[in-house]
């Protein structure tokens, strides 16, 4: 179980949201929705421990993710902007992720699922935005963690790829995984998802 308790986040001197709480249980999909600039990405990056919350806590199975390396190893994050290095080939990227997790045996399965075999020798920077997205999402399968956190999972994907990723996410949840997604609005792809709405804030600047 992943639990966000009274989380507040700040960007610069602007309070994005405050006292946000929700629980994401195993076997569930949580969809974080909100307007552009509302703080969806900031919340996801806080959940995975990349940036600190201004206040509140994020816990996985009762352990604070900011101090537990065991928690971080159970989470895979795929951001809206890919973290892939442009000069690396697709094969090199998959091997790097697998090396980080000790999951080299999963490279072929990820490449097969996302149809990456024809582009394994292509440098990431030379791919279209749609193929770059497929490569970025393949990290979910290579890393094989219990918690998936994905920012705008369907951006830049064609309809066939959207269906592929939808099935992947549903299957992960059915098998007991925790899936947290962010998008601009609710969609019909995950009708049973828990919705976490980030409301507009009128709090303005933050003072200490």
Curated annotation (Swiss-Prot):
Matches recorded under SMART domains: AAA
GO biological process: cytochrome complex assembly
Gene3D superfamilies listed in its UniProt record: P-loop containing nucleotide triphosphate hydrolases
Binding site for ATP: 34-41
EC number: 7.6.2.5
MF terms in GO: ABC-type heme transporter activity; ATP binding; ATP hydrolysis activity
Keyword flag GTP-binding: no
The entry's keywords: ATP-binding, Cell inner membrane, Cell membrane, Cytochrome c-type biogenesis, Membrane, Nucleotide-binding, Translocase, Transport
Domain spans labelled ABC transporter: 2-208
Localization annotation: Cell inner membrane
TM spans (from-to): none
Protein topology in the membrane: Peripheral membrane protein
Designated name of the protein: Cytochrome c biogenesis ATP-binding export protein CcmA
Highest taxon of the lineage: Bacteria
PANTHER family recorded: ABC TRANSPORTER I FAMILY MEMBER 1
Family: Belongs to the ABC transporter superfamily. CcmA exporter (TC 3.A.1.107) family.
Catalytic activity: heme b(in) + ATP + H2O = heme b(out) + ADP + phosphate + H(+)
Subunit structure: The complex is composed of two ATP-binding proteins (CcmA) and two transmembrane proteins (CcmB).
Disulphide bridges, residue numbers: none
Organism the protein comes from: Anaplasma marginale (strain St. Maries)
Stated role: Part of the ABC transporter complex CcmAB involved in the biogenesis of c-type cytochromes; once thought to export heme, this seems not to be the case, but its exact role is uncertain. Responsible for energy coupling to the transport system.
